[in-house]
């Protein structure tokens, strides 16, 4: 498979990857919206639930500023990322694996942007009822004010803080508490892989350098020239 992909144009591979991830993300979200009531849970395992929540903020439910500002910020950020990816693909100086990491981040960002822009218009509300797709009475919000659909919940560790602990003593805690979606996973995995596997390449790009130093490969020591 790796050798087959290496023979394909990088642009087509990363474009196909982004489209595939977007389809998976939206299929999951639409399934949740059209089969579950807000707050409903399906217990898959003691440590994993499909728990339907919506958030107006960023990844993992983080909120920052107004909804319209967040939507516009996402669009600008993803526009820059797409421009950067297209530029790197044209230069043909980076591996497909590196470009795929960027594609994960872009696909995740676009997936949540779709929720923010369209979901408020194409879905009815999910409070106390299953949402309808393209309701006759209109959606639950206006353009750019849709809420992001989250569903993956991993309560891996549950317990109670020791009573002697300041501030939180005696309170219950859950790890991992945030509820997230497939798009959030793509963003997180892409970022982690970039930072762990390609720190030098990322550093050079952030410094505005277009290429790696001569005699080096991505995140390798300089190669000895015979």
From Swiss-Prot:
Q: Does the keyword Transmembrane helix apply?
A: yes
BP terms from Gene Ontology: proteolysis
Report the GO terms under cellular component: plasma membrane
Q: Which UniProt keywords apply?
A: Aspartyl protease, Cell inner membrane, Cell membrane, Hydrolase, Membrane, Protease, Transmembrane, Transmembrane helix
Instruction: Tell me where it resides.
Output: Cell inner membrane
Ranges annotated as spanning the membrane: 12-32, 69-89, 103-123, 173-193
* Catalytic activity entry: Release of signal peptides from bacterial membrane prolipoproteins. Hydrolyzes -Xaa-Yaa-Zaa-|-(S,diacylglyceryl)Cys-, in which Xaa is hydrophobic (preferably Leu), and Yaa (Ala or Ser) and Zaa (Gly or Ala) have small, neutral side chains
Bilayer topology:
Multi-pass membrane protein
Metabolic or biological pathway:
Protein modification; lipoprotein biosynthesis (signal peptide cleavage)
**InterPro entries reported in the protein's UniProt record:** Peptidase_A8
Which EC numbers does the record give?
Answer: 3.4.23.36
Molecular function (Gene Ontology), one example: aspartic-type endopeptidase activity
The catalytic site is made up of: 150, 184
Record bears the keyword Phosphoprotein: no
What does the function comment of this entry state? This protein specifically catalyzes the removal of signal peptides from prolipoproteins.
Q: Which PANTHER family match?
A: LIPOPROTEIN SIGNAL PEPTIDASE
Tell me which family the UniProt entry assigns to this protein.
Belongs to the peptidase A8 family.
What protein name applies here?
A: Lipoprotein signal peptidase
Organism of derivation: Porphyromonas gingivalis (strain ATCC BAA-308 / W83)
Question: What's the gene?
Answer: lspA
